Amino acid sequence: VYIPNGQSVGSEKFEYKMKWLKGLHHYLEVLTQTNEKIIILGDFNIAPQEQDVHDPEVWKGKVLCSDEERAWLKKIEQLGFIDSFRLFDQEEGLFSWWDYRAAAYRRKMGMRIDLILISKALKENCIRSYIDEAPRALERPSDHTPVLIELGL
C-alpha cells in the first residue's frame, strides 16, 4: 500500500488521508472474511508508536504521528493484523524514513512509517522482520529504506 502523506493535520489532504484509511479499513474488513493469510506492506505514512519516532515531542499531534492516524492504524490491527516488526526485540532508533530537507539520515532523525502487517494466522510463520538500512547510505538513495520479512511457510 501507499497511504497518502496527509500534508498537515486539518488540511484537505489530511481529510483525504482519513477517507483513504476508512476505505482501506472497509476493503480489509471484506478481505478478511474470505482470506486467512494476508500481508499488507508498504508506506503507511503513520508512525505506529512513540518509539517509532526520533523525537516524539517534536512530532506530537503532527501528520504521521497524529492521534487520528494512529486510531485508524489501530482499527486495521483490530481486524486481526500484527505489526511484524514488533514481534521481535528490536534495538532503539530503527527507522525506515528520513526527511531529505533536514539532512535527517546523517543526524539519525527518522521515523518508522513503512510497515509489514500480517494476519494472526501468519504469526507462527514469521521468522524475522527487519529494516535494511544499507541502501539508504548509498550515493542517491530514496528517503525510505526497505523493510523486510522472512516467513517459514
Located regions from the model:
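Active-site regions of metal-assisted phosphoester/phosphodiester hydrolases
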Residues: 1-153
